Amino acid sequence: MLFKNVQVHGATGSLVTDVRVKDGMVADAGTGPDTEIIDGSGLGLVAVVPATRKDQGHMVGRVEPGIPADLLLVPRGSMPRLGTPWWRVIVGRTDLRALLTRGRVVIRDGEPLDRPANPDGARIGVWVDQNDWLHQELLPQGRYDETRGGRRHAYTGRYWLDGDRIDYLDDSGFYAFGEFIGDQLFHAEFVMRRQARP
């Protein structure tokens, strides 16, 4: 896969370049056969990289050769800042042009591609923030239902797990992300733990 003329964060600022993905990794641009070419004109590409401390999960980072191709493609004006925790990123559905996980496209032009929501069911349950204000229920069929401040069904939508990361597509039209770090779920400004089952 080749992203042509896409903006990335470089070591000395932003630049427009070509980015090649091969075997699940970001490769040197070079030349070679590409099964798919994506026009990146007007778009920006960022990487999802491990944070500097392991207990902080992942963050928005530079797209560089040799890293896993966990990539987000959005309009340039919507590019999240370097260093932003991944679980704080929110993108409008129509702005999310592509999301790649280990080089595999899982969202394209705002549409989720076929993948299992919760392959082993390990994260199913109600996750509650420290102030008991947010209750996020991850349902077995790949749906979530949030109660916020006692208001039931405040946000509802679909979710997909990818290792310790979770992708949300809200019914109201935006994507958000989260991450399981230890026994906690980080999402937006919330830190949640799974509620004990009765």
Predicted regions and their residues:
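Short loop/turn motifs at secondary-structure junctions and domain boundaries
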Residues: 9-12, 53-55, 88-91, 150-151
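His/Asp/Glu-enriched, well-ordered alpha-helical/loop segment
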Residues: 50-76
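Conserved, mostly hydrophobic/aromatic
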Residues: 42, 66, 103
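N-terminal metal-binding scaffold of metallo-dependent hydrolase/deaminase domains
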Residues: 1-34, 43, 69-73, 78-85
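C-terminal cap of metal-dependent C-N hydrolases
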Residues: 17, 71-110
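Short, small/polar residue-rich loop motifs at catalytic or cofactor-binding pockets
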Residues: 12-15, 31-32, 55-56, 92-94, ...
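Lipid interaction determinants
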Residues: 94-99, 104-198
